[in-house]
Amino acid sequence: MTTPHLDSAQDIDLSRVHLIGIGGAGMSGVARILLARGKTVTGSDAKDSRTLLPLRAVGATIAVGHAAENLELSGELPTVVVTSFAAIPQDNPELVRAREEGIPVIRRSDLLGELLEGSTQVLIAGTHGKTSTTSMSVVAMQAAGMDPSFAIGGQLNKAGTNAHHGTGEVFIAEADESDASLLRYKPNVAVVTNVEPDHLDFFKTPEAYFQVFDDFAGRITPNGKLVVCLNDPHAAELGERSVRKGIKTVGYGTADAVQAHPEVPAMATIVDSQVVAEGTRATINIDGQEVSVILQIPGDHMVLNGAAALLAGYLVGGDVDKLVEGLSDFSGVRRRFEFHGAIEGGKFNGAAIYDDYAHHPTEVTAVLSAARTRVKAAGKGRVIVAFQPHLYSRTIEFQKEFAEALSLADAAVVLEIYGAREQPVDGVSSEIITDAMTIPVVYEPNFSAVPERIAEIAGPNDIVLTMGAGSVTMLAPEILDQLQNN
């Protein structure tokens, strides 16, 4: 089925929207905004979850399980059906009925594009760091009194939500490239954190993946700006190409990266950063104004994300000092180096449990490097990781890189591959990663046995990370219990 791409709010009636998979991170966010705008929202999800409770509380009618009759509300059908074409099969009974009834079926990105209309659009794109950078931008702009609307792929720890319909002119959102959805938007400010081949099951070649970011840059409004990270080679090259095309482009990055790419005017330069007791202290020059910010979440990649967030806020009129105050107050996003607890007493005294969404070698490297920095600053402990590969295609494509990245830990437990939307591949297991690792590693295909395996490896003051985009997140509290009670 061909999915319509809509050009204006007049093309579709959003008065009564049905969302299939409403409990997902992206879908639940747009549902919140629709409800805040007074729309009637129904939806369905395969299983009940804590995500559905607040949506029901503000007026959504949600069914658990998929059935044709879920489309009806008091005998009336929706004006539009929204779905994720990657996650929802085409024989879903609600999709089938929508087609039979002639109801328009659109993607989440089409809906988000409609919701963005009329706002000053700040879109955060890139292979890695979208959710963190978007979240930092939100918190910074909120502190600057801008009350932006936002839709992000994770839940802000402090706000406890992934979306908000604000009173300000700015709307901040992630621009997902995985299926070229980012080409639905017309940003006023487009941030590209990095560009590295991914989602090759969709794009087929790295060249096609790179091209989608060039196309995205071409959709920026005439008076808008492209913002690129100069520390990332492909993002910097995108910036250089865009400058030559006449697209207004600025860069951010460390001083050496800024010097290496003089063709892209730098508007945010990281002058210095160092680990301190509170986190990471960074000195950043924003368009000639030098500011100091303390980031609670560790890692050089988070300093870069913070610089991007400050620059995005500055470009849409935010006061730099207030933006910095907000950024210093940023406590993270669910599943991004998320703290679950520490052990007090016993043989695991001082061990701390964290959970992270990292599922690409570059992300794994960044998170483990940040953990190592924290251990080094403390002068004690090790880094232990429980990693669950996500998708067979990604595991096969990056098996060598995963082995190298995971070897930054001191020891690891690697779970079986989480296939998600993919079917198992004969002869392929997580052992293609573990066989190439250079640290002590346990391949553990039994999900429920992982906490025990971690207890056999961990020690006092260790940082223990559960990592991956699948079900591994459920193990963080179980590992905490295992170590606390062992």
Swiss-Prot record:
GO terms for biological process: cell division; cell wall organization; peptidoglycan biosynthetic process; regulation of cell shape. Keywords: ATP-binding, Cell cycle, Cell division, Cell shape, Cell wall biogenesis/degradation, Cytoplasm, Ligase, Nucleotide-binding, Peptidoglycan synthesis. The keyword Iron does not apply. It catalyses: UDP-N-acetyl-alpha-D-muramate + L-alanine + ATP = UDP-N-acetyl-alpha-D-muramoyl-L-alanine + ADP + phosphate + H(+). One of its GO terms (molecular function) is UDP-N-acetylmuramate-L-alanine ligase activity. Pathway: Cell wall biogenesis; peptidoglycan biosynthesis. Its EC number is 6.3.2.8. Its main location: cytoplasm. It is found in: Cytoplasm. Transmembrane segments: none annotated. ATP binds at residues 126-132. Belongs to the MurCDEF family. This is UDP-N-acetylmuramate--L-alanine ligase. The gene is murC.
